[in-house]
Swiss-Prot record:
It is a multi-pass membrane protein. It comes from Pan troglodytes. Its main location: membrane. Residues 50-57, 121-140, 220-236, 293-313 are cytoplasmic. Glycans are attached at N5. Keywords: Cell membrane, Disulfide bond, G-protein coupled receptor, Glycoprotein, Membrane, Olfaction, Receptor, Sensory transduction, Transducer, Transmembrane, Transmembrane helix. GO terms for molecular function: G protein-coupled receptor activity; olfactory receptor activity. The keyword Cell membrane applies. Disulfide bonds join C97-C189. GO terms for cellular component: plasma membrane. The chain crosses the membrane at residues 26-49, 58-79, 101-120, 141-158, 197-219, 237-259, 273-292. Belongs to the G-protein coupled receptor 1 family. It is found in: Cell membrane. This is Olfactory receptor 1G1.
Length: 313
């Protein structure tokens, strides 16, 4: 089959989950509900952290950035899917597809970096509490977040430019509900070896850094917690990182199922459904995990609601 240069491609077709009208209506309602809950929850977390000066600490600075990344992450994919269902279309422009790929990779990797940074923050808070303010200075916090944004922006740009260099066959149907890197590579007529090599090297290196940061940080955290003599002290120390551990488990577990499962067990429909877990469900649950498990967030939420009641007519 003759290849077609990318400059002549005008659009791709996102096959999504189903072509049945009734199923699409159910999907539209479900995803719209999850999207609105996700956006409202994450924006509320950001609002609470900004308005409550007691939460102006490194831990909540990182949490606010994670909530922003979650809101942007889901906004990269779900609105386009909802719009396509609404107008009964599967099309996405070529430039729109590459743009979606860029921002998807940016925010998914940013989330991984922020989770690793938050693990380091918990390590310092629990293992070096007397030096916490000195180590986690405002300058370091801003540097860690800024570096995460910049590195992942460049990382995503590299993969998007490499994707732009490929040529595609006549089949432009993507068996997914958004433009992910694996489905796009499978449509290429050109040899994607360079793309796959760069993914293996850069993705493996960044993934290894994040995983090592998580493992080393929490190995030291648990070692320190076990040395605390009182049961109350252990519970208080563990409560500091329990929410973060829950979010890491959700994000990493669902991502691992999609990208690192054996090829023999993978199918397009299965991957699409599994992708929903880490692209939509996990970001939606994160605000609930942090608000339900974190006493300071719950207290700040109550104060915010109380202030609004007082000032309401």
């Amino acid at each position: 089959m003759e290849g077609k240069n990318l400059t002549s491609i005008s659009e791709f077709f996102l096959l999504g989950f189903s072509e049945q009208l009734e199923e699409q209506k159910a999907l539209f309602g479900s995803f719209l509900f999850m999207y609105l809950v996700m956006v409202a929850g994450n924006l509320l977390i950001i609002l609470v952290i900004i308005t409550d000066t007691q939460l102006h600490t490194p831990m909540y600075f990182f949490l606010a950035n994670l909530s922003l990344a979650d809101a942007c992450f889901v906004s990269t994919t779900v609105p386009k899917m909802l719009a396509n269902i609404q107008i009964q279309s599967q099309a996405i422009s070529y430039s729109g597809c590459l743009l979606q790929l860029y921002f998807f990779m940016l925010f998914v990797m940013l989330e991984a970096f922020l989770l690793a940074v938050m693990a380091y923050d918990h390590y310092v808070a629990i293992c070096h509490p007397l030096h916490y303010i000195l180590i986690m200075s405002p300058g370091l916090c801003v540097f860690l977040v800024s570096a995460s944004w910049i590195m992942n922006a460049l990382y995503s740009l590299l993969h998007t430019l490499l994707m732009n260099s490929l040529s595609f066959c006549a089949n432009h149907e993507i068996p997914h509900f958004f433009c992910d890197i694996d489905p796009l590579l499978s449509l290429s007529c050109a040899d994607p070896f360079t793309n796959e090599l760069v993914i293996f090297i850069t993705g493996g290196l960044t993934g290894l850094i994040c995983v090592l940061c998580l493992i080393i940080s929490y190995t030291n955290v648990f070692s320190t917690i076990l040395k605390i003599p009182s049961a109350q002290g252990k519970r208080k120390a563990f409560s500091t990182c329990s929410s973060h551990l829950s979010v890491v488990s959700l994000f990493x577990g669902t991502s691992f199922c999609v990208y690192f499962s054996p090829p023999s067990t993978r199918x397009a429909q299965k991957d699409t459904v599994a992708s929903v877990m880490y692209t939509v469900v996990t970001p939606m649950l994160n605000p609930f995990i942090y608000s339900l498990r974190n006493q300071e967030i719950k207290s700040s939420l109550r104060k915010l609601i109380w202030v609004r009641k007082i000032h309401s007519p």
